[in-house]
Swiss-Prot record:
The keyword ATP-binding applies. This is Deoxyguanosine kinase. Heterodimer of a deoxyadenosine (DAK) and a deoxyguanosine kinase (DGK). Substrate binds at residues 32, 44, 55, 79, 84, 149. GO terms for molecular function: ATP binding; deoxyguanosine kinase activity. It is an enzyme of class 2 (transferase). DGK/DAK plays an essential role in generating the deoxyribonucleotide precursors, dGTP and dATP, for DNA metabolism. ATP binds at residues 8-16. It comes from the Bacteria. Pfam families: dNK. Keywords: ATP-binding, Kinase, Nucleotide-binding, Transferase. GO terms for cellular component: cytoplasm.
């Protein structure tokens, strides 16, 4: 039984890889609520006003998901609570949160992480980070077509997206809740190429075998 969490910037392909990987491993996918998120469009319309509310919304849903995943112990999550502070801190750094909101957010996050520490299974088994360049990120954002994410909707998103990518490297380096690995999302287009998809799956399975989570003769479910 394994719990795998994915990470990566907006448009990296986390939800797509979650579906591919969960089917391959025979586990259950957990998807972050985006299309039915009532706060996300408001945030893109007025980031300063809604940054705190959006992050509390995400924090709550990610906390619920990781609790369920750790209890079930057989899941792939397309994003997790461990990544949450990265987004809020970036928004705070560019003036989209008051000092009071920053204090409230981190107190809430601390309380939630403390509750996870009391669970029988405290951490995921593996973090899979999808590393992409700005060009790849933008191409995938354009392809999925959410209007409020497009540079044509708000040209200032260019700075936001580039800044977000800069925040990921130190976050990944500091992450220590579980073993971790990186997928090269520029080189391996696992959404469009069957060959690349299989290579990504092979890399993840090899890591799980190295960790002792899978036997050497483990066989996957068939991927259609």
């Amino acid at each position: 039984m394994t719990v795998i969490v994915l990470s990566g910037p907006i448009g990296a392909g986390k939800s797509s890889l979650t579906g591919i990987l969960s089917k391959y491993l025979g586990t259950n996918p957990f998807y972050e609520s985006v299309d039915d998120n009532p706060v996300l469009p408001l945030f893109y319309e007025n980031p300063k006003k809604y940054a705190f509310l959006l992050q509390v919304y995400f924090l709550n849903t990610r906390f619920r998901s990781i609790k369920s995943a750790l209890t079930d112990d057989n899941n792939v999550l397309d994003r997790s609570i461990y990544e949450d502070a990265l987004f809020f801190q970036m928004n705070a750094d560019i003036g989209r949160a008051t000092p009071e909101e920053v204090d409230t957010y981190y107190e809430l996050l601390h309380n939630m992480m403390s509750e996870l520490d009391r669970m029988p299974k405290k951490n995921p088994d593996l973090l899979v980070h999808i590393d992409v360049s700005y060009d790849t990120m933008l191409k995938r954002i354009q392809k999925r077509g959410r209007n409020y994410e497009q540079l044509s909707y708000d040209p200032t998103l260019e700075d936001y997206y580039k800044r977000l990518l800069r925040y990921y490297k130190p976050w990944y380096e500091k992450y220590d809740y579980s073993p971790k690995m990186t997928i090269d999302g520029d080189k391996l287009d696992f959404m469009a190429s069957e060959e690349d998809r299989q290579e990504v799956l092979n890399q993840i399975v090899a890591k799980l075998k190295e960790m002792g989570k899978f036997e050497d003769d483990w066989k996957p479910n068939l991927v259609k």
